[in-house]
Amino acid sequence: MKNKNISLCVIAAALLMGKSVKATDFVIVKDNTVIANQACLTAAYKTNRPPVKKRLFTSKAVETEILRVKKLLTNQKLAWMFENCFPNTLETTVHYRTTDGKPDTFVYTGDIHAMWLRDSGAQVWPYIQLAHKDPELKKMLEGVIRRQFKCINIDPYANAFNDGAKGGDWMSDLTDMKPELHERKWEIDSLCYPLRLAYQYWKETGDASVFDSEWIQAITNILKTFKEQQRKGRVDYYKFQRKTERALDTLNNNGLGAPVNPVGLIVSCFRPSDDATTLQFLVPSNFFAVSSLRKAAEILTTVNQNTNLAQQCTDLAEEVETALQKYATYNHPKYGTIYAFEVDGFGNHLLMDDANVPSLLAMAYLGDVDINNPIYQNTRRFVWSKDNPYFFKGKAGEGIGGPHIGYDMIWPMSIMMKAFTSQDDEEIKDCVKMLIDTDAGTGFMHESFHKDDPANFTRAWFAWQNTLFGELILKLVNEGKTDLLNSIQ
């Protein structure tokens, strides 16, 4: 991923937040990574939201929720951060319009002006629960779903798209690039997030109008792509190479990646971090595919009465689930039976976790496994320990990172996932306090921060993590944990 004029983007984001920032930036060429080494604090807790006239989208229902939650929270910094973070996707990344008489919403990931299927599906997710209270919000969400289906039908192998046939920074990649694509990294979860979003939108609003011919084409393409990437026959439906200094931005073996044994699992050439997989059966993403396919089958049966496609979804979900039970576990000497992060069907296992969702830690958050599943609980203990090579602990906090940013950089997303999947109030409290204490005084979440210095962080404007933080706080309030939040000092 390339972000031109990246230092200017950081400055612009800082101005958008109403902050004065001095920073020395470390830039990785053709990557979105910026490490800002110092952020200056402003007085008190003045809102860092854009001025009302500069907000891209405003929802009355969201504003009502912000006021409600702020009144309940006595921790002023937490209330301030919630107000900054929860509407961040709406106010800074949502480009809503009407195309051919139907809602159409293009969602930037933040500092990169492209739409990731994963990020966009996660960014607007917490607003679905409010859609029945706000017709305009409902239309905006409908527009995201329709845009995602269109993107899938342009190319189901792509992870990120342009707003129009503009071309972009990665047109020279050795893969079947198109001008509509920002990037063409094959990641299973890119096709799962739209299914998760559309299903929940339907359940919350009762609106089935999005499941039209575009939807049928999209789910047909999703099934075709998943089956191709089981690699039971041809292995070259998808190839990817890039001239780069980052080993995880390209695939070995002439663009095919490491070999797999066709045991029923689905290849994911890249992770949700956009880094290449080591062993190409990415376990959390295969679990996500199972739950997403079952949601699609329910839609196809109930709304479309398309029993043929529904059965294909169900059959594939069962095949992948059976293969996961057989090949995705590992008998760890310390933790017992756990899920591996990646496998290849030949008996090899990669034992680690990455912060990006879907992750092993996040499987219970996504609903892919039961939170009380003993294998999941063993895995959860493993990934939040020094036995996970990408778990870092320092003076500022502890959590999971990944090779996308590298050593000692903790992703707040992992701390949020620990809180989302926790059944222990003290653990939840510790996670929220850590998130409050590692914002570097900005009032926002960042992509990652250094384990010993939260002012050393990457990406000043990363809407997914901001909205996810808002989702977490809203969930805790709605579950009656306001007193727990207010006990945080």
PLM-predicted stretches and their roles:
Residues 37-51, 249-265, 487:
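Acidic, low-complexity proline/glycine-rich segments
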Residues 25-118:
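Low-complexity, Ser/Thr/Pro/Gly-enriched N-terminal "stalk/linker" regions
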Residues 113-141, 145-248, 463-477:
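Aromatic-rich carbohydrate-recognition surfaces in CAZymes
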